[in-house]
């Protein structure tokens, strides 16, 4: 059934959507109202970066900051914005693969709209100091986004502890269904819509909901978080053995 429809099968479908949303939100310590489902992590990244850029451009803030080794969903979104007249600063990592908060702060300008730094690098595995970078961004009134696709379900992720404004994730990274992602937006943070149409996702992302995908994503993340300590201990054992 269609979860937006007012008949019995539609109500049943909506229950699956609501349950999946609650499961994903709980896993990252967010409110269900702060979670918006997407088709993948790349869509969530595009929405966070481009939606923020379009929103902040109305305040004459057209500068963005990211790292030089982000996922292509971020890098290509930034490149697209540059072609539209936005300016982007790319922070180079240290030799060990980390982004230093002081380098981010040095790059912030009065017209900076967004800082977007990947939480866990998908190629070299470094985990960035997102909490400290978010504190720097907020000190200057700048929104903070992190691509946590590689982190959610693999390491503890608590959006309140991190202090981020937006966070992207993808279901397939924690054994959920492909074609499902989500964007966390802290209460009061609204990047401009990229997909307009119906009133789904609190009018922020149109399109009939992928009920099975949402249910699968919620259950998969619930299971991943439940067994997280056990899995991390096993992976540490394997790493140390190698």
Residue spans for each PLM region:
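Pyridoxal 5′-phosphate
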Residues: 1-242
């Amino acid at each position: 059934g269609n979860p937006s429809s007012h008949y019995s099968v539609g109500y049943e479908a909506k229950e699956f959507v609501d349950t999946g949303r609650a499961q994903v939100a709980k896993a990252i310590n967010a409110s269900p109202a702060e979670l918006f489902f997407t088709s993948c992590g790349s869509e969530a990244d595009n929405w966070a970066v481009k939606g923020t850029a379009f929103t902040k451009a109305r305040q004459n803030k057209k500068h963005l900051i990211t790292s030089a080794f982000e996922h292509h969903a971020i890098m290509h979104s930034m490149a697209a914005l540059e072609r539209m007249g936005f300016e982007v600063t790319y922070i180079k990592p240290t030799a060990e693969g980390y982004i230093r908060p002081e380098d981010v702060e040095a790059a912030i300008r009065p017209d900076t709209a967004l800082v977007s730094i990947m939480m866990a690098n998908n190629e070299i595995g470094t985990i960035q100091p997102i909490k400290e970078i978010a504190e720097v961004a907020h000190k200057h009134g700048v929104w903070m986004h992190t691509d946590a696709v590689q982190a959610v379900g693999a390491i503890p992720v608590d959006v309140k502890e991190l202090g981020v404004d937006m966070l992207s994730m993808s279901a397939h990274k924690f054994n959920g269904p492909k074609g499902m992602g989500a964007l966390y937006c802290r209460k009061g943070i609204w990047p401009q819509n990229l997909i307009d149409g119906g009133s789904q996702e609190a009018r922020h992302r149109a399109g009939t909901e992928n009920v099975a995908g949402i249910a699968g994503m919620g259950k998969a993340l619930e299971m991943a978080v439940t067994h997280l300590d056990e899995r991390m201990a096993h992976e540490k054992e394997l790493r140390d053995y190698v």
